[in-house]
Structure formats: structure tokens, C-alpha cells
Amino acid sequence: MVLADLGRKITSALRSLSNATIINEEVLNAMLKEVCTALLEADVNIKLVKQLRENVKSAIDLEEMASGLNKRKMIQHAVFKELVKLVDPGVKAWTPTKGKQNVIMFVGLQGSGKTTTCSKLAYYYQRKGWKTCLICADTFRAGAFDQLKQNATKARIPFYGSYTEMDPVIIASEGVEKFKNENFEIIIVDTSGRHKQEDSLFEEMLQVANAIQPDNIVYVMDASIGQACEAQAKAFKDKVDVASVIVTKLDGHAKGGGALSAVAATKSPIIFIGTGEHIDDFEPFKTQPFISKLLGMGDIEGLIDKVNELKLDDNEALIEKLKHGQFTLRDMYEQFQNIMKMGPFSQILGMIPGFGTDFMSKGNEQESMARLKKLMTIMDSMNDQELDSTDGAKVFSKQPGRIQRVARGSGVSTRDVQELLTQYTKFAQMVKKMGGIKGLFKGGDMSKNVSQSQMAKLNQQMAKMMDPRVLHHMGGMAGLQSMMRQFQQGAAGNMKGMMGFNNM
């Protein structure tokens, strides 16, 4: 994600405070210069950058500060607060009502990724248990209906459109009426892309809006145009009642920061951001968690939401087995399935404090997903006895012929099968030790259920299993312990502690 470059530069500037022996005006000005340069390079409007600098300077009076105060943390807090303000329009975004029919109309310029974004939004709500559908009212662009149809079919989302009817108002009206009669909760209408100067298309957009009376009009905006987004958003707001904005293509353009701040300047709430071409490269936009992730401070709230989506609490049988320190190959297979359901690895890693959104490149991510699928393919070639055995890898060591059979069945080498079994053995040993810790699976605050000595042992075991590079990014053992504590308590509000920003 190109925005990660901005995050890395700002984080580097903030960390320079830690290297300074004394925090004085000179150090503060040097740090602010680095932050402002990074923002200007990301195409943030110079007036907004100047305002941020002035606000931080006025909030931090080094001469008036009491000697006992932690000046570094006060400065970091002030910068964090101003960065949040930079992308916060200060307007509450529209949200759909469960059990009600919510009609959402998409508008935007040609090439902004509007049709793809329609499918992403429908898929996002579908995964959360909403009844969603898509309507293609774009009769201007050749192939628009085919594209929407292809996306909808792949995601198994009902859709409506026509190859013969050329009036978008009729298509939109018929589609909305059809899906309302079928009690769909999220009805998304894709309209023709337009350019600012095309009055006829603007007129068409108004006619469609008047016909279907949408609950929310979403303007889809391409991040690559940077701060020019402000003029565009205002032009559309003047014509129709744009209630929300989705910014796309944030993964490939250095001007993403400028685009986000420009939209915020129009007082239009950004509800989602597009971070890639795949259907799950799509995230809700929340200002504080966004800045937290940008600076490598994580988003525990978002991570917990992802885990809750999997409904892991329903898996009582697994919890019971873990209590007794049991973990089979089938259990590992099911956990791999859960990881796949959570979405792109880079998105998940960005939510873990200590990892930036740049920690895993697209190439590494694809490689990791391919490796995970390969491991699952190997397990697909195992029989029930092998998958459900509590002896795990011992079944294979007693009868080496099983390894050769699984390797042939999955089209891999015997070494690949042995590597999987080695990995599984590490997991199983960890679970066995966890099973011996009373109170670990009671739920609630882990610190109240588990003794400090047992918790220390558990953290040491986890640290041994982890890649040293990963542990370093988390801030060593202290970072790992802090993350475990936050995740168990479901505490999203104190994620800043991960980088030492405890007073934020």
C-alpha cells in the first residue's frame, strides 16, 4: 500500500524524538518539518499542512511544560490528534438499518472503480449477514452490465439489469421494485460514470435519484487525483445530495493522503476505502483506527471484529478440546479455513500493533496464501484416522508409508508432508501446554483468571514459536504480552500503548 510510505515517514519523524537527548524547540521544529514534508509529498493541501503545524505548535509550549511531564509523549499525542483531524470531516456517516430496505445509489466519474466498488460493498454486507443485491443502471458504458454480472455471480449476489432496455431510470425503478418485493435489505444501484462537464449525464443522475429515492447517495472517488478530489466532491454535492464517499485505488497511488484530506475538507464522510482489485480489498474507514494502522500502531478493534465475524464462540467442541490440551490435524485445517475467511493477510497484519501496512508486500501475501492452500491440499489427502488422531504426527512416524501416500495424493514431495507435520507438532505442543493452564479458556480478563507465572510461561512458549522478525516488529516480549492482554480484554481504546503512546 503506497500510503504505508507516508506512515513510515511520519513514524520515523516521531521516533526521532526518542533519539534526542533534550526535547527543545529545535528538535520539535525538525520533527514537524519531517512530518509536513511527508504530507506535502502525499499531495496534502499546503493550507491543511500549515494548519496542522500551527495547531501542534500552539498545543505544545515546551517552556510552560512542567518538568515531570513526558514531553515526547505529549508531542506524539498532539501530532496523532492533528493527523486524525486531517482526515475527519466531523460529520456522522449514514449507516443502513437492519431489517429495513436500504437503497444505495452509486455515482462517480468514469474509471473511478465504481462498478467494482458496488460489488465490494454488497459483498461486505453479505458477509455480515445482510440480504444484499445489485442493479446495473449504467447504460452508457459498453460492458458495464457484463462486468457487474460477472462480479455478482462470483460473489453469489443477486443482480438485475437489461441488455435491451436503454433507459436507466426504467431499469433502476424496476430493479428496486423487484428487490423491495423480495425483502432485500441492501439494494445497490450502479449508475453511468460521468465527467464534470457532461450536463446530460448529470441530468440522468438526477432523474434516477428522483425515481428511486435512495436512502444514501455514495460518491466513488479515485485516490490518484490527490487534492483535486475536493473540487470534484463539491461539484457533485452541488448537483445531488451526496451523503457518503468511498475512496478507491489507495493501494497504488502516492497521492492517497491528499485525496483523503481533500474529501474531509468538503465535510463529506468517507465510509469505506478500496485498497486493491480483489473483492475483499475493502475496509470501513474510521479515522482513529486508520491513523493508528498508518503509524504501525494497529487496530485491535478491527481485528476483534474480524474474529467475531467468524463466530468462533460457537465452536464449543474445539474450546473443550483445547482445555484438555488436545489439538488434531483436523483442528489445524479448520483454523486455516478461518484464516482464509478473515481476508487479505496484509489487512490483518496491519491491525496488529507493531506491523505497518507495508510489512507484507502483495508478492509475499500471494506467496503466503499459496503456501496455506498447499498445506490444506496436503491435509485433504489424509484419511479420517490421520486427521482425528490425538497422537498426531506419531501415526505417520509409526507408518512412514502414510507420508508417501499423502504426498502422491496431493501432488507434493514427501518433504512437504514432513514439514507440515513438523509445523503441526509445534502447534500441538503449544496447545498441550496451554491446556495445563487453568482459567485460560474461561473468557473475560485473562489477567484475573491466569496467574502471572503461568502467563509468563505461555508468552515464552509463544515467543519461541514465532519468527524473530515478527517478534521484533511487535516490540519484543513486552509488545507480545501487551497485545495478548488487549486482545483478550477486547480493548480497542488503548491501542496506542503499543508504541508507548500511553497518554493519548
From Swiss-Prot:
Residues 296-504 are annotated as: M-domain. It is found in: Nucleus speckle; Cytoplasm; Endoplasmic reticulum. Residues 1-295 are annotated as: NG domain. It catalyses: GTP + H2O = GDP + phosphate + H(+). The keyword Nucleus applies. Changing residue 226 to E: In SCN8; decreases expression levels; decreases neutrophil numbers and migration capacity; faster dissociation of the interaction with the SRP receptor subunit SRPRA; reduced SR compaction; impaired interaction with SR; impaired detachment from ribosome; effects on enzymatic activity are unclear as both normal and reduced GTPase activity have been reported. GO terms for biological process: exocrine pancreas development; granulocyte differentiation; neutrophil chemotaxis; protein targeting to ER; SRP-dependent cotranslational protein targeting to membrane; SRP-dependent cotranslational protein targeting to membrane, signal sequence recognition; SRP-dependent cotranslational protein targeting to membrane, translocation. Pfam families: SRP54 (PF00448), SRP54_N (PF02881), SRP_SPB (PF02978). Keywords: Cytoplasm, Disease variant, Endoplasmic reticulum, GTP-binding, Hydrolase, Nucleotide-binding, Nucleus, Ribonucleoprotein, RNA-binding, Signal recognition particle. It is an enzyme of class 3 (hydrolase). Its main location: nucleus. InterPro entries: AAA+_ATPase, P-loop_NTPase, Signal_recog_part_SRP54_M_sf, Signal_recog_particl_SRP54_hlx, Signal_recog_particle_SRP54_M, SRP/SRP_N, SRP54, SRP54_euk. One of its GO terms (molecular function) is ribonucleoprotein complex binding. Component of a signal recognition particle (SRP) complex that consists of a 7SL RNA molecule of 300 nucleotides and six protein subunits: SRP72, SRP68, SRP54, SRP19, SRP14 and SRP9. Interacts with RNPS1. Interacts with the SRP receptor subunit SRPRA. The NG domain, also named G domain, is a special guanosine triphosphatase (GTPase) domain, which binds GTP and forms a guanosine 5'-triphosphate (GTP)-dependent complex with a homologous NG domain in the SRP receptor subunit SRPRA. The two NG domains undergo cooperative rearrangements upon their assembly, which culminate in the reciprocal activation of the GTPase activity of one another. SRP receptor compaction upon binding with cargo-loaded SRP and GTPase rearrangement drive SRP-mediated cotranslational protein translocation into the ER. This is Signal recognition particle subunit SRP54. It comes from Homo sapiens (Human).
